[in-house]
UniProtKB/Swiss-Prot annotation:
EC code(s) of this entry: 2.3.1.180
Catalytic reaction(s) noted: malonyl-[ACP] + acetyl-CoA + H(+) = 3-oxobutanoyl-[ACP] + CO2 + CoA
Organism lineage: Bacteria, Pseudomonadati, Pseudomonadota, Betaproteobacteria, Burkholderiales
Source organism per UniProt: Polynucleobacter necessarius subsp. necessarius (strain STIR1)
Family stated for the protein in its record: Belongs to the thiolase-like superfamily. FabH family.
Protein name stated in the entry: Beta-ketoacyl-[acyl-carrier-protein] synthase III
One GO CC term on file: cytoplasm
Keywords in alphabetical order: Acyltransferase, Cytoplasm, Fatty acid biosynthesis, Fatty acid metabolism, Lipid biosynthesis, Lipid metabolism, Multifunctional enzyme, Transferase
Active site (record annotation): C122, H255, N285
Residues in the signal sequence: none
CDD domains in the cross-refs: KAS_III (cd00830)
Length: 328
């Protein structure tokens, strides 16, 4: 008998501090950096983003999203077998202890609930779903919490107009459970380390110092060109693996990086933007959190309904990309 990983529920959280484009324009002007609401919107589709408070950690955002997801299912944290957290901005320098372990403790999950982080930047949530799906299909775990959470505001260079206006903080989560009913239909992951320098944090820690820049850097044109190309390819791979055609997809739920990338991908897929869940205008690029944020938004708005076919896809630094086909 086949076992599927079914999406039992979703949840999300955005920090209280919301900065509109104009708020950011005024903040940057104080440091001598010029930009405008029109410049930001035209190039990205972003109108606002949320930043975590000084005392708010990635794990705090993750817990809020996780609690919302659990609440939507009636499943308790004590019932969880596994927690997988996708993040590039962990609570601790060096990435350990894992932020997933911190979340496990804050949620009050049992020590029998395993917990670990996955790092694939903006593709992280698709990677985490693929890992969770494999564990559930193998029969190893029955109830898995998958989270994408980021505090990217802490690695932004506010002297770099090309990046600091694009990113925000947030978290999204899904609860997966073993089911006889179809859920996750296919997963595909890819990586190309030769493209690692076009989107990265170049600094390295050593002997108590950061050698190189501690801020993220991005070659925007190179990222755009590669992203549109690989997203179309991986989307078709996931659909072929799930034995679906593009016209059978009810909703494309893409990584919310840039409206132009989403429009380019939809066009190459032959899909109308009316079938794309778009939330980038509300929170900017939240890296690993963006797909689950968009997914939960679609569920809460009533756009995404049970029985519909969804295609999730994301691409990020590494270079890494992935896609997941789901019957919701």
């Amino acid at each position: 008998m086949s076992i599927f990983a079914r999406v039992a529920g979703t949840g999300s959280y955005l920090p209280e501090l919301r900065l509109t484009n104009q708020d950011l324009v005024e903040r940057l002007a104080k440091t001598g950096l010029e930009t405008s609401d029109e410049w930001i919107k035209t190039r990205s589709g972003i109108s606002a983003r949320h930043f975590a408070a000084e005392n708010e950690l990635t794990s705090d955002l993750a817990v809020r999203a996780a609690e919302a997801a659990l609440s939507s299912t009636g499943i308790n944290s004590a019932d969880l077998d596994l927690i997988i957290l996708a993040t590039s901005t962990p609570d601790h320098l060096g990435g350990f202890p894992s932020t997933a372990c911190v979340v496990q403790d804050k949620l009050g999950a049992h020590t029998s609930c395993a917990a670990f982080d996955v790092q694939a930047v903006c593709a992280g949530f698709t990677y985490a779903l693929a890992v969770a799906d494999a564990f559930i299909r193998s029969g190893s775990y029955k109830k898995v919490l998958v989270i994408g959470a980021e505090t990217f505001s802490r690695i932004l260079n506010f002297q770099d107009r090309g990046t600091c206006v694009l990113f925000g903080d947030g978290a999204g989560a899904v609860v997966l459970e073993a089911s006889k009913e179809a859920g996750i239909l296919s997963t595909v992951m890819h990586a190309d380390g030769s493209q690692r320098d076009i989107l990265c944090v170049p600094g390295r820690a050593g002997n108590g110092e950061v050698r190189g820049s501690p801020f993220m850097t991005m070659d925007g044109q190179a990222v755009f060109k590669l992203a549109v190309k690989v997203l179309e390819q991986v989307a078709h791979e996931a659909l072929d693996k799930a034995k679906l055609k593009p016209e059978q997809i009810d909703w494309l739920v893409p990584h919310q990086a840039n409206i132009r990338i989403m429009e380019g991908t939809a066009k190459k897929m032959g899909m109308s933007m009316d079938k794309v869940i778009v939330t980038v205008h509300e929170h900017g690029n939240t890296s690993a959190a963006s797909i689950p944020l968009a997914l939960d938004s679609g569920v809460r708005s009533g756009q995404i309904k049970r029985g519909q076919h969804l295609l999730l896809e994301g691409v990020g630094g590494g270079f890494a990309w992935g896609a997941v086909a789901i019957k919701y």
